[in-house]
């Protein structure tokens, strides 16, 4: 399984060489890093997405989850709070709700 993960990461990195601003590829890469517990690398990819497209709402939720896994609760809270209006603006009330639930869990 780790081998497949490494292959996917390698493929995504190669694709990003042709278009480093492709947020969809970066998001996929970040998720692969998360699957492999490479959380710093995942967060780095999410931050690259925010620089290119601050309206990429799914990245806020996933980045917040990665930060929670690292124990960085305050930073995770910031990502969830920032992502809620982005998700709402794009019409994704389900994702906004997921981020609200994540915030509620952080408050417990």
Model-derived regions: residue spans:
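Canonical positions in the second alpha-helix
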Residues: 14-15, 48-49, 83
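Structural marker of alpha-solenoid helical repeat scaffolds
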Residues: 18, 52, 69, 86-90
């Amino acid at each position: 399984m780790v081998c497949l993960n490494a292959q996917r990461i390698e493929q995504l990195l190669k694709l990003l060489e042709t278009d480093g601003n492709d947020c969809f590829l970066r998001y996929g890469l970040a998720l692969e890093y998360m699957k492999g517990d490479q959380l710093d690398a995942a967060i780095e990819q999410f931050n690259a997405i925010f620089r290119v497209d601050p309206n990429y709402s799914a990245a806020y939720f996933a980045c917040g989850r990665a930060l929670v896994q690292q124990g960085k609760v305050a930073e995770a809270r910031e990502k969830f709070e920032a992502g809620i209006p982005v998700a709402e603006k794009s019409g994704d009330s389900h994702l906004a709700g997921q981020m609200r639930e994540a915030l509620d869990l952080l408050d417990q």
